[in-house]
UniProtKB/Swiss-Prot annotation:
It comes from Vibrio campbellii (strain ATCC BAA-1116). This is Large ribosomal subunit protein uL5. One of its GO terms (biological process) is translation. It comes from the Bacteria. Part of the 50S ribosomal subunit; part of the 5S rRNA/L5/L18/L25 subcomplex. Contacts the 5S rRNA and the P site tRNA. Forms a bridge to the 30S subunit in the 70S ribosome. Belongs to the universal ribosomal protein uL5 family. This is one of the proteins that bind and probably mediate the attachment of the 5S RNA into the large ribosomal subunit, where it forms part of the central protuberance. In the 70S ribosome it contacts protein S13 of the 30S subunit (bridge B1b), connecting the 2 subunits; this bridge is implicated in subunit movement. Contacts the P site tRNA; the 5S rRNA and some of its associated proteins might help stabilize positioning of ribosome-bound tRNAs.
Length: 179
C-alpha cells in the first residue's frame, strides 16, 4: 500500500474531522481519481507524435492511455470529427496514490523556478486542476529518448463539497501551494 494512503488513513482523516467537525468518517473528503490529459494537436499531420505522446503517458502513469478523438469538425484547426487529437488516463486506487506521491515529492520540485502551485485552481466543487509544461519532470521519462517536450493537464477529483475542504485535503498531503 502506498505511504500516502496510509498517511491519509492514519492522520489526515482525524485532522480534517477535527478541522471541519464532521460527525462521520464518511464525510471526510477523499481523493477519488486523478486524470492526466495530453492534447497533441500536431497529431493531425503526423500520427507518430500521438504514438510517442501515448508512450510517454503510459510510462508516467503505468497504464495504457485512451486515445481521445475530436468531437466535432473545426475548419480553423483543420480537424474533422473523429480525428485522434490526444490521450488521457484515469488513475484510481493504488496507482492513483503512487502517482500523487511521485507528483508531490519528486516531479513538482524538479520544475524549473518552482515556487509552488496556485491555490486558486479549484473548480468550486473541491476538484483541483493544474498544468505541467514539460513531461520530463517525471523521473520515469528518459530525457534522451524524448522526441518533443510536451505538457499535460492533471486533474485531482475529490469528494470534497467546497474548495476550502479540497484545499485542506491537499494541504494535509503537503501539496506545494504558493504562499
Amino acid at each position: 500500500m502506498a505511504k500516502l494512503h496510509d498517511y491519509y488513513k492514519s492522520s489526515v482523516v482525524a485532522e480534517l474531522t477535527k478541522q471541519f467537525s464532521y460527525t462521520s468518517v464518511m464525510q471526510v473528503p477523499r481523493i477519488e481519481k486523478i486524470t492526466l490529459n495530453m492534447g497533441v494537436g500536431e497529431a493531425i499531420n503526423d500520427k507518430k507524435l500521438l504514438e510517442n505522446a501515448a508512450a510517454d503517458m503510459a510510462t508516467i502513469s503505468g497504464q495504457k492511455p485512451l486515445i481521445t478523438k475530436a468531437r466535432k469538425s473545426v475548419a480553423g484547426f483543420k480537424i474533422r470529427e473523429g480525428y485522434p487529437i490526444g490521450c488521457k488516463v484515469t488513475l484510481r486506487g493504488e496507482r492513483m496514490w503512487e502517482f500523487l506521491e511521485r507528483l508531490i515529492s519528486i516531479a513538482l520540485p524538479r520544475v524549473r523556478d518552482f515556487r509552488g502551485v496556485s491555490a486558486k485552481s479549484f473548480d468550486g466543487r473541491g476538484n483541483y486542476s493544474m498544468g505541467v509544461r514539460e513531461q520530463i519532470i517525471f523521473p520515469e521519462i528518459d530525457f534522451d529518448k524524448v522526441d518533443r517536450v510536451r505538457g499535460l493537464d492533471i486533474t485531482i477529483t475529490t469528494s470534497a463539497g467546497t474548495d476550502e475542504e479540497g484545499r485542506a485535503l491537499l494541504a494535509a498531503f503537503n501539496f506545494p501551494f504558493r504562499k
